[in-house]
């Protein structure tokens, strides 16, 4: 299913909840739920007895089927809660098994907002490590289509404590909302990818899958193509890449390239550190160390003299920056 499941983790008072709630109100879509005031049954559902009968009361996620739920203060969810959300997040199905058992659709777009469990982001060498403190099971981390990390140190205080100009909107609010509704109403057979787009997805998936460390499984070579495709669909819909009088959403190669740039910009950010973490893990891998050493030896041997090789390395700004 082409629905997003994302998380934003970062320091308190960075505006995570304020921005998400503001956008939800502006577009008139979605529901914001505070995990600190909501049990798992409130999110998914539970059984209650009325007289001699047991009834299922569905929670906020299945009640917003094909919509959006923003879960604020997601750090209040326990590790078992993340595991119990697995079927909703992977299959879009909510299930309650008590005295009675029922299932229902929960094809809901999910955005989790959370602070790091017990530290400030500055206490982590790489911000992405906070995810492992929050969610212990790798398979639950892997279900996120992407993760964003924010820190109070990212924006200078001087840029915050000053007057700002009012935002000028390019399009009216109702048109923006209609575009979202149109996107969400597309069925799977109404979303098509051009051949160039499909080839680009495979190309990007291979590149990302080979580089990023699966110890933090936000990117895995086995399934990252689906995450890239979902983000590409979002770009295509935002630009209204339509065909057949608006009934078809057409994803092109450019939209896939935008999706790849988006993911790279997230994971290469200093505060996120997923790129740097993966680079470090590769440097610690003995097999890769030998491969790199062999490559360097071959590289040096290709020069006519060692002096030429040393001169090139000393004048190479990329090597100096590393």
Q: Can you annotate each of these PLM segments?
A:
Residues 7-13, 22, 92, 199, ...:
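A charged, low-hydrophobicity C-terminal interaction/regulatory region common to genome-maintenance complexes
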